[in-house]
């Protein structure tokens, strides 16, 4: 049985990447000997309990950077008959350099879950071309890899998996526009909640449920107070099982992000027949189909945002059409693409 080691860094335990990892590892463990390597101890560890017990979890628990480097070096130097799927650019670079220097035979495949250009975490140009192959989770990332002059045959577009769910029942007799946001609470930066709060200020009959927390929670709450929208918002805090909390169909998910990789909460929402209001970050249209499963607006354009919110209220999108709009992400199609892509890279 072939061995695969999934290399991850800086996982919090609360994000969409962890959700995808659970599904992918639990699928692949039936075909490969799987190890999950974490270069940090996640803040939240409940997600690890959802991983198949046949998956070996290898976690760095030290604190010094030198110890961490040695921990990672040992993987590439001493593991036998193992290929690597890396969610970490630094580990792609390190593994590829060791492979070349010591003439190792393993494959290093990148699998990144965020936009490659809208970030300052690593130098894409001097990192990504070293990988033997790339699993792209969105058309935007696929295009970014091509722009780095990576050969087309080294890139496979696989998207991300999402379960197929029943459509949630409609909220009874509500004339209110019920919006929700789920994710890290950030006033500015990636999640850009400032814009969301500005948007709901302009509409009277709206209520926003915010599921999540973060270092900027207090700043967001203070800004909501300053904008006079505090009474329109319920702050739920960190919610480990979002869909046990949301039992009836809200009007829409709202996202005002500056950038995303492929938003899992967006997919989870659409899969339940709930439309999406979103900023036009790169790759948003991998999921959102205008007037079919949601509405979009240009970042910074609050007038467009309020119009998108009003469209949700005035145009009753068919929840079955919403759900069916992302059929390519459902397990049967997704795992077919994943399996064939891995076979292509690992057998080459």
PLM region spans:
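Aromatic "clamp/platform" in nucleotide-sugar-dependent glycosyltransferases that forms part
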Residues: 258
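N-terminal strand-loop element at the rim of the active site
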Residues: 6-66, 216
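Active-site donor-binding acidic/aromatic loop of nucleotide-activated sugar
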Residues: 216-219, 230-240, 245, 295-296
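Short hydrophobic beta-strand element within catalytic cores of glycosyltransferases
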Residues: 275-278
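Short His-centered aromatic/hydrophobic patch
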Residues: 85-93, 112
